[in-house]
Amino acid sequence: MFCVAGCGRVSRSHVAPKYSIYVLGKGNDAKEYVLQTSSLDAGKLSPETAGVAVNKDEIDRELIVRNGYYYHFNALTDEFCKYEIAGNRLKPVSRLSLPGFRLENYEWLAADSLLLVGLDASSFAQAQYVLLDVAKMIVRSQGSLNIPYPREPFKSMSLGFVYRRNGLLFTGYSYHHPVGASDYTTSDTFYVAALGWPGMDVRHIDRDARSTYPGGINTVQSYAFTDEAGDFYFMTCPGIALGNRPDLPTAICRIKDDSMTLDKNYFLDLSDSEIANHGYGLWYLGKHKAIVRSERKDLFKGLGDHWSTPHFEFYVVDLLSQQVEKLALPLDKGTRKECVIVAGNRAYIAVNSTQEGNYIWIYDADTGALTKGLQLVGDTDYMLRIDVL
């Protein structure tokens, strides 16, 4: 069940859907929707007529989308679930119990081989992994990542990315200590561990005190990629809504293809560039260029309005020359969103603008042109994620 762009009601068509859009509706008791469409280039869609409503007790926007299926870990039930759109709902296909596990990041190792990394549910201090066969929905293996536990004054940790290359598994992490009853802050250092795969023995650990909080939860937003040369890039995220160390800069870092160590000679300091703010989201355009989504600290008051105030800008960053170029897009709202899809020389960018409406904008990487594509209308407040099916 899906909608070709431009239709107003849920309908069937011989044109297969290519994209998925996750929408948060309006109001205090907002509904959430999943829409599928064959095109992001033009037309209008209304989630209440062209999409399916989501059962918020079972699922939220923290999704892994692949080959028409939606995968979600439910921390309330300790279940990893596989869904598909059938009839007029998002229907569970199968479930796996993963007791005591809390998902932080994932990496596809093969078509049906999905690696989950996360933390123990009781202390958030022990790094763990689960390797799944999602075709059969079975656990192939699971265990611990042998990286150091937090030490005083730190109580917990976060895993910001996971990346496998040949016989190595890389993960970035940082440590946290609580501030009051419901907040935390982060160490002034981030770490990158190279582990043997699949044995998980530690081969090397880098530490870097120039920034902190490497990556983020990639079921919510992208923060890392591999380029054509096999070099791996990731963004540190010390802003108030992630690492909560705004005194440290947001930066792009690199692990070269022929190395198991952090490239200490590469540190693209975005906070010291024209951007001069903290970043939330990183997507690869190709040809050594990437899109960065950045906050505007002069436009929001604090964490309380960080998500609701339109203040996010988009920049194209040249990873080699380290030059940045601001895209002429309306200010976006929503702290963390999976809002960019790159297809060939085009980038589709979902922007929720209070002035110009909710559009998928199309950026031509060859010419620099920006045009409006698909518009989301009706009960649309935020486009929280866009995915290739």
How would you describe each model-predicted region?
Residues V54-N67, L98-A111, P150-V162, P214-A224, ...:
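Repeated scaffold domains used in trafficking and secretory/extracellular systems
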Residues L35-L40, Q126-I138, Y184-M200, D247-M260, ...:
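Beta-propeller blade signature
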Residues V34-I138:
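Post-signal peptide N-terminal segment of secreted/secretory-pathway proteins
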Residues K44-K56, L90-F101, I138-P153, D201-R210, ...:
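Beta-propeller fold detector
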Residues Y163-D298:
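Acidic, serine/threonine- and glycine-rich low-complexity intrinsically disordered segments
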Residues A16-N28, V65-A75, A111-S123, G167-H176, ...:
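Short beta-strand elements that form the blades of beta-propeller/WD-repeat-like
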Residues M260-E356:
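Intrinsically disordered, low-complexity segments enriched in Gly and acidic/Ser/Thr residues
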Residues A16, G27-E32, A75-D78, A121-A127, ...:
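Short, solvent-exposed loop/turn segments at conserved positions within beta-propeller repeat blades
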